[in-house]
Amino acid sequence: MIATISADIVRSTSLIIGDLIKLRNKLRGLFDDFEKDYPGFWARIVRGDGVECFVPDGRYALRIAILIKLLVKVQVSDMDCHDHLHRYGVRFSIGMAEENYADKAEDIINGPAIFLSGRNLDEISGRDDVYAAFEVFNATDSVNGLLESYVSLLSNMVDSFSVKQAEVVFYKLLGYREVEIGERLGIYQSSVNMRARSARWGLFNSAIKDFELIDFVEICG
């Protein structure tokens, strides 16, 4: 299954232009890393504050979307901006389908997955109580409803993280060991572990991994 992610920065107009440029550059750096880790992945920044990602192996779409959300939450922590941006970072929508057309050289993403992720992002963008959406093309309403609730719960966990918790979870999701994270953040390994436990890292990580085990082709069968 192919996935696309459509996302936008919450209340981005509250950022001064210099901070928005800084944030966009951080996102581009993360996308460069994703291109190395997930073959065929590519992403683009649209409309100034929007993001569209093409994920050839859709199982990893949730991990990628959560990492984007964590990055933005951490990066804006010392910026003067709206409280909603500090808390939520981004709202995102994931669409999945068996077929989708994407051409990085021509800057084209087309097909049912991007239609779903884009449409559902538009639907939640006007709300202050929903920050994640998920839909699989041709899946039943009950399956899509269950999976969307699952994705939303994980997104809500990120919303509840402090900045210190968010930066630790960000690096752990990228695969860094606690000693390495401590070196990056300039703190002791014991402090990294404490922040991870207070963020319920074990549960959070298990939920991400369980999502990656789902056979999306079968549930659409």
Label every PLM stretch briefly:
Residues 1-221:
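Regulatory and interdomain segments flanking nucleotide-handling catalytic cores
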